[in-house]
């Protein structure tokens, strides 16, 4: 069985809630992946004396969902019940927990749950080789604690801008690379021993068996980075998401898109669903999960924004009808053709950060109404190509996501030239054999044929584009 389905699974899991002056919504979609390996946690009011605290997290599993699912249920308990976390609470209430104790307790909780899961029989005997990233926030009345282990990401939107982002843990990062090499490993094609695309994770015990090294000195470390930030009146929202989201949207793009959607709807589940759909239409091939946490100062629904959004929908509906009427004599155009025509137009008031992909559902609804016999699969534009042509487009798209500078410009030109040739009926270029190197390469990998956690299925990536946005943009104290 391959890593991808023939058609994406677009059914979504949703949840929402409110409390402690917060509102949250979440959405997750399996997408093109054969399995759903993401999980999440959302707790408003932490039990046992922390009722005015809240905890949210996203877990991006790889090589299976075992670790991600267990962590989503038990990580918070491992954090709040260990002695390091509770040390300061002995003298008073939860409000008196010191910042350092909370941060140390979070770190201890990660190490303890990783040690605990190692004893599971299926993980111990190698029957299950899964692992998971974890990104979360613990929100107290005065502080926000950002927690990250892996390459999922959290961002804080404050006073109309992205003011903080967690840093992705990639093998190519100098600090991570040094630890990997000190443990006897190597970094090849941006991966640990040429295979695993994250340098910190829970689980992944095949990468945590170097004799004489502690748990935080292994090829893959379970140690999280913890940042503490004082809450402010200007705080608007926090986004937690896996790399299936960040692969196709930058920090700023996603935050601007979310802000624009909050101005047209106060339903946080809907906003999260729009994000997931938009990322699918932008070409994400991974599982997708997002948790949106809104503070009291989050953007409110605006009559003007609602009006502009409605006018945009009507304009798009009208244009789709016109395009299909003009093409009537030549036969019904496919949806990809309609999208290409619209993408070449200067359409005002498209959702910032989302662009035309953010209105794909509107366009597709009109197209399906006018062409009821079409088999809709919810795929992105590239996925509507067939056979080797579709594979070529996908390979070029994945390379485009993961390259910058001159390489990226070259790939943009290749992709544009290919699409133009197809539209004009010219012969398409042959599919290059080495374009999409398997991400499951086991070169130097202690795990044979394990599905590696990767942001794209191309092993040719020079630089991970998401690192461009990673890292703190504001001085948050880090453990």
UniProtKB/Swiss-Prot annotation:
One of its GO terms (biological process) is regulation of canonical NF-kappaB signal transduction. Mn(2+) 2 binds at residues 60, 243, 286. The keyword Repeat does not apply. PROSITE patterns: PPM_1 (PS01032), PPM_2 (PS51746). Residues 23-295 form the PPM-type phosphatase domain. Belongs to the PP2C family. This is Protein phosphatase 1B. Monomer. Interacts with PAK6. Interacts with the phosphorylated form of IKBKB/IKKB. Keywords: Cytoplasm, Hydrolase, Isopeptide bond, Lipoprotein, Magnesium, Manganese, Membrane, Metal-binding, Myristate, Phosphoprotein, Protein phosphatase, Ubl conjugation. Its cofactor is Mg(2+); Mn(2+). It catalyses: O-phospho-L-seryl-[protein] + H2O = L-seryl-[protein] + phosphate; O-phospho-L-threonyl-[protein] + H2O = L-threonyl-[protein] + phosphate. It is found in: Cytoplasm, Cytosol; Membrane. Residues 1-14 have a biased composition (Basic and acidic residues). Residues 440-451 have a biased composition (Polar residues). It holds the Pfam family PP2C_C. Enzyme with a broad specificity. Dephosphorylates CDK2 and CDK6 in vitro. Dephosphorylates PRKAA1 and PRKAA2. Inhibits TBK1-mediated antiviral signaling by dephosphorylating it at 'Ser-172'. Plays an important role in the termination of TNF-alpha-mediated NF-kappa-B activation through dephosphorylating and inactivating IKBKB/IKKB. The keyword Transmembrane helix does not apply. Highly expressed in heart and skeletal muscle. Isgylation negatively regulates its activity. The modification Phosphoserine is found at residue 386. A lipid is attached at residue 2 (N-myristoyl glycine). Mn(2+) 1 binds at residues 60-61.
